[in-house]
Amino acid sequence: MGAEIPAEIHPTDTHSIPESGLYYSDASCELFPDKPLTPRGHVVVGQGGGFLKALLSGADERGIEIRTGCPVTDLVQDGEGRVTGVVAKDGSKSKRIRATKGVVIATGHFNENEEMVNRHIPMVKRNPRSVATGHPSALGDGQRMAEGVGAEMVGMGDISPSMYTAGAETSIHSMMVNLRCQRFWSEQGYTNNFRGTRLTQQPDHQGFAIFDEKIRATFGEVDAAEAEFKADTIEGLAEACGLDPVLLARSVERYNQLCETGVDLEYGKHPEFLDVISEPPFFAMPLAYVWMTSGAIRINENAQVVKPSGEAIPGLYAAGIIAAGRMGKQNPGSGYNMMWNFYTGRLAGRTVAAEGESE
C-alpha cells in the first residue's frame, strides 16, 4: 500500500518484528524462475491487539454490547429448523438469547479440546515435542454446536502444521533427516508451513537437523542452546539420537558430496546454503511443529452454514477460521488466516444485516 520497508529489516526470514511493523518475509522458493517472488511482510502496529482495538472502537460507536464470561453452550432452533438464538451461561445460570436475524459462529479451532483431538487428529501425539498453537478457549464449541444441528463438517482430520527449530538460520544450513536417516527436504523451502507438512509425512512425524561445529558457531545463543545432541563422530551422534549409525553416516556422506559439487540433485537447495558437515563436534536438533486444527463448518457464498445436501440452515452463519474454505492440509502462507477472518466476517455480517427478523 505504498509503505516503504525500512533498512532495519533482517535479510532472511529469521527476524523479529521491528517497530515500524514492516519486515522481510522470505520468499526463498521460486516456483516460476522467470517470475521471482518479491520480499514482503506487514504487521499492523500492536499486532493482533491493533486489529482488536479498531474493531472494539467500531462496536462502541454503534452501541454494540459485548458480553464476556458468558459462554454459549447450545443453539436454539424453531420447529422448522431455523436457528433463532443461543443458550448461554451467565454465572451459574443459563439463559436463552433470541437472535432476531441470525447467529454467527466464529469460535475458531478445537486445539484445546483433548477429546476432539484424540478422536479426529490423534497423529499429532506422535511427536512429543509438537504442540498446539492458539488460544486456550479453542475448545471446539462451534464445531460441536454446528454438527448438532446438521451442519456439514470439513477437514476434521486435518491439521495445519508449521515446523519450528530455534530459527530459520538453524535449519537452512543443516541437513534434515527423518528417523530412517533419510533426507526429506531442501531445508530452505518457503515458509515453516511447508516444512511442517513435510515433517508430518515422515515416520512418527519426527526428524533431526544435523550440523557441525562450523555451522553451530554461526548461531545465536538461543539457537545454539537448542542443539540437544552432541558427539565427536557422526556415528556417535546417531547413537545419541537413537538413529542407525550406518544409515546416518551414509546420508551425511551423500549430502557432503552434493555440497562439494554445489548442486543439490535431490531437492534443489541453493548453493549458498550447502555447507559440508565435517568439523566435529557434530550436533543434532530434534524437529517438531506447532499445529492448529483445520476442522471447519461448510458455508456457501453468503457465509450461510449448510447441510451435507448443500441446503442452508436458516439463521446460522460461520466466519473466520471455523468457516471452511480457508485451507485444507496446508496453510498457503503468512497472513492468510487474517485475511480469511476479515473477509468471511464481513460477508457474514452483511448477509445477516440484510435478513428480516425471524418469526
Task: Outline where the language-model segments fall.
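Internal hydrophobic alpha-helix adjacent to the cofactor/substrate pocket in enzyme cavities
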Residues: 145-152, 241-244, 249-252, 259, ...
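An anion/pyrophosphate-binding glycine-rich loop and adjacent beta-alpha core
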Residues: 17, 135, 139, 143-145, ...
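Glycine-rich loop(s) and the adjacent beta-strand/alpha-helix scaffold that form part
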Residues: 46, 90-163, 338, 347
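Glycine-rich phosphate/pyrophosphate-binding beta-alpha loops
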Residues: 159-170, 189-196, 290-294, 322-338
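Conserved redox-cofactor binding core of oxidoreductases
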Residues: 1-94, 114-115, 261-281
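A glycine-rich dinucleotide-binding beta-alpha-beta segment and adjacent secondary-structure elements
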Residues: 74, 247-330
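Hydrophobic alpha-helical segments, especially N-terminal targeting/anchoring helices
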Residues: 77, 177-178, 184, 299, ...
